[in-house]
Amino acid sequence: MKFAHIADVHLGYEQYNQPWRAEDFAKAFKVIAEKAVESNADFVVIAGDLFHRSLPSPRTIKEAVETLWMFRKENIPVFAVEGNHDKTSRDISAYHLLESLGLLNVLGLRRNPVRGENVESLRIQNVYLVKGVVDDVEILGDRHRSKWQLEKVLPLLKPQSDKSVLVLHQAVKEVVDIDLDMAYELTINDLPEASYYAFGHIHLPKIYEFDGKAIAYPGSVERYDLREASKIVRYRDELVLKDGIRKGFILVKNFRPEFVEIETRELYDVEIEDESVEGLEKKFLEVLGRADKEGIMVAKLKSSDAVDVRRLSEVAAKRVRYAEIRFERILEEIEEVEIKQESEFFTEFELKLLELLRGEMDEDEVYSLVVEHYLSGGALKQEEGAEERVVEEETEKKVEEQFKGDEEADEAERRAEETEKAKSTKKARKPKTLLDFLGVEEE
């Protein structure tokens, strides 16, 4: 038993608003069909998103008919489910049009039974489960569903044969968790029994093994977005080139998957960085020189100075089929500033004065603090010599700033008079107020 597993064809997708990109997707589908026919496949499954939209254009439908006819001519039955892009809330979709032409069979729950050479309908309450049959192999499946809908639908997709294929367009948690950042609708434990799980929806080719069986995603047939680039280019200090994602389909032999690669248009994911504009442009031109002229390039350029993106885009348009260039400025790194504690700069007395400046002490407390400090020798006891005088002068300066004293000359004169008074009376006079103690006249 041999069959082709295809998914995410996205016929009609004019990527980057370029009509010729829709032609690329149609061409990829045709190449896959040719390879499937050459491999003598017994049947084909399409696991969703045959079309990019639920209402494809006449041109897109024509492209689908022409390729599916290749299978019809060889009597190779095709079984398909609708994906999230091309499903419709109506009873009839583009899939049913193709079904009426005898080009494919739509799997899943239906209001009415469908019967044919390779199709059976099983009544379940008031609906019918339409499934495919090729020799002794059952092909079951259903359209893209929400998580809560799957809870009701999956138990109905149980095979009656020992050999079966389950076709779904959903994301399985265990596969998504490998290296993809996307939501999922089900887990492996939710899946009904099957010999092979033919999935669509994830655009990167993935084959996940469990219990000797495969959950497989062939990926999209063409490069749907930048995550599916064929070449990854990084150029900072040196040029680094890496191969990207392969495109194709899966050929399944006796329920064992084998990926078959096809050639598609090159898509370059480019990031270039240089401090100078001149260096950046030189690197960009070097990368352009290596690119295929029929390829697509999406480039992010980083520099400290602004780059003329428009001019570079014009240059790139002459070297490749299509280019998108984005600029990102390199921001200077901000140095971390160490924040020191106030205690590292001020004495204990000065810290207490700071509390005054913040309005956290009343006048009586300040008065007691200053008197106690100066009567005990204050800052003069801390160190000797010139350093003592510096500390004292800085302390006096802070106090002067707090209370907005008069000019230094007047202040010195008043202190001299007070000193003479003290000598004549030989008795210390207790200051009446803090302002009086500091020699500042009250206004």
Swiss-Prot record:
Cofactors (names): Mn(2+)
Summary of activators and inhibitors of this protein: Nuclease activity is regulated by Rad50.
Binding positions (Mn(2+) 2): D49, N84, H169, H201
Record-listed Mn(2+) 1 binding positions: D8, H10, D49, H203
Class in the EC hierarchy, top level: hydrolase
Enzyme Commission number(s): 3.1.-.-
Region described as Disordered: spans on this chain: 382-429
Protein name as it appears in the record: DNA double-strand break repair protein Mre11
Top-level taxonomy: Archaea, Methanobacteriati, Methanobacteriota, Archaeoglobi, Archaeoglobales
Gene of this entry: mre11
